[in-house]
């Protein structure tokens, strides 16, 4: 018997796991009991449980020992004990990939699959499909077709789910079962209907027309399964994002109609789908927000959490749409669930007024230590949106500095540091307070990335403060106490103080001379370089070599250096071979209006022209609808040999860079013109469409197609 532990033991973790100290060799030794006659179901169950526990804990089983245990386990099919038989099915599925000759149990599983015991049939189908390969699938095809349309829902669902897995092995064979899947889709059982819809979609997902027909059929005839409705909403949403009809499509009407469904799950899925559609207007969002507002007062914590989390996302882009929910969100501030209360406060910070900031900050500071790092990051992001209130910067800075002192992971600390840095850079009045908090933080900072980032900021902003000398101690402490990367960053920061403050220069030169004795090459090289530059006492040299740094493309330089090391050459590395980095374009930031941020309106004719131009290029035909085109950005000076402007066209998973090029040399004719791009690691250049020719003073257009990474926030 397994001892029953009380709640206190469970929470402390002491003795709550009876399998905690299992040894694989001892368990495999115990498995020999499978060969005994008569079979003892209770003892065999306990041993199978131990084997499954070890497998799920990641314990490695060798092929020979796994095969031995598997063959011994097959003898347990002689027992008629239901629990033992179902445990055998589980073990077969887990050991299918590590044992040899697992097909030996095919006949036993087929017998159970076609037998009269319904309790065996479903699990037997799942286990059989787990050990079946492409060559054996046709042998059980007849049984699978019968199982899909079986009257017993557990059998039908098992066959449908197994069909989904079998598609990866033999899509063509499973495609022949489409008629049976369609019959199952009309089942009265909610899970059978849901699984059947999943099979039908995966069989047709590469055929847009077939998927559209399937959607039309089910949206007209209706469904009994709330799970199937949720899947239909997701399919419709995916098609809508790729469609050119936009929100005038019948698909949008279907999703909106689901807001009036009797199932809460379907209502939330529809609201979430509408909110995540690109280019959604406030009018189109209104019904979804109204539904979420009702969920905010639900007695169910899961519904309240889902509603407030979704409203939190809406508030980032459409704060005015959420202001109607402010009263409901105020009521959630005191919710017993800390996650719900946190999201309610952060949403109100995005949508509320300046007068409410103090109260909300005080409210959240009372329990911020109790919430997880994930929600602390959400809090910091919400606070960063309140930067439009300069009079509240001191309150925000105090709150952030207190959070910075608390324990937390890298992402949490990074969010706080980024928020303080943005306040320092945008508000001169908060500069000294922000720098003081950051100096205190790097005295005990375990994250190299954050320490170097703060040192860079100190080097940039510190020399321009009224008393720059007070930061020198904090920076030089890093040279004495930290690792190589931080020491190197500290040396660069010191050099910037010496370059901009004549009174501090003698002290900085002494400190740099000490750094020349460092054990690390990088630190010594930087110190030597900066010392020699500063000793010249020339502002032009300081500007070129200390303030501005490298103007080349960093990814381009990395690739060029890697190529240089692969092909040994006597010639020195040529920096001129590296493409220059694009100068940062500082756009005037529009203040974050917590009521209604007016989106930048592009003339419809311009957007339509771009859509038409891009659709005419074969390489861009399948990119889907064009979401937005940026304003032209000038990449070169007007008087250079070649004048280049860039327009970025945003699609669902891609960006098209349009380069408008003009040749200003009257004695040259360029042909097949492209613009070389060096993307970061996670981005991928798929193709370039060159401009056929570029005669004198006649503009030409070339394009570059780049795939966005999955985790990219713009994707």
UniProtKB/Swiss-Prot annotation:
It is a peripheral membrane protein. Disulfide bonds: none annotated. GO terms for cellular component: COPI vesicle coat; COPI-coated vesicle; cytosol; endoplasmic reticulum; endoplasmic reticulum-Golgi intermediate compartment; Golgi membrane; growth cone. InterPro entries: ARM-like, ARM-type_fold, Clathrin/coatomer_adapt-like_N, Clathrin_app_Ig-like_sf, Coatomer_gsu, Coatomer_gsu_app_Ig-like_dom, Coatomer_gsu_app_sf. Pfam families: Adaptin_N, COP-gamma_platf. GO terms for biological process: endoplasmic reticulum to Golgi vesicle-mediated transport; intra-Golgi vesicle-mediated transport; intracellular protein transport; organelle transport along microtubule; protein secretion. The modification Phosphothreonine is found at residue 593. Residues 1-11 have a biased composition (Basic and acidic residues). One of its GO terms (molecular function) is structural molecule activity. Residues 1-20 are annotated as: Disordered. It is found in: Cytoplasm, Cytosol; Golgi apparatus membrane; Cytoplasmic vesicle, COPI-coated vesicle membrane. Oligomeric complex. Binds to CDC42. Interacts with JAGN1. Interacts with TMED10 (via cytoplasmic domain). The coatomer is a cytosolic protein complex that binds to dilysine motifs and reversibly associates with Golgi non-clathrin-coated vesicles, which further mediate biosynthetic protein transport from the ER, via the Golgi up to the trans Golgi network. Coatomer complex is required for budding from Golgi membranes, and is essential for the retrograde Golgi-to-ER transport of dilysine-tagged proteins. This is Coatomer subunit gamma-2.
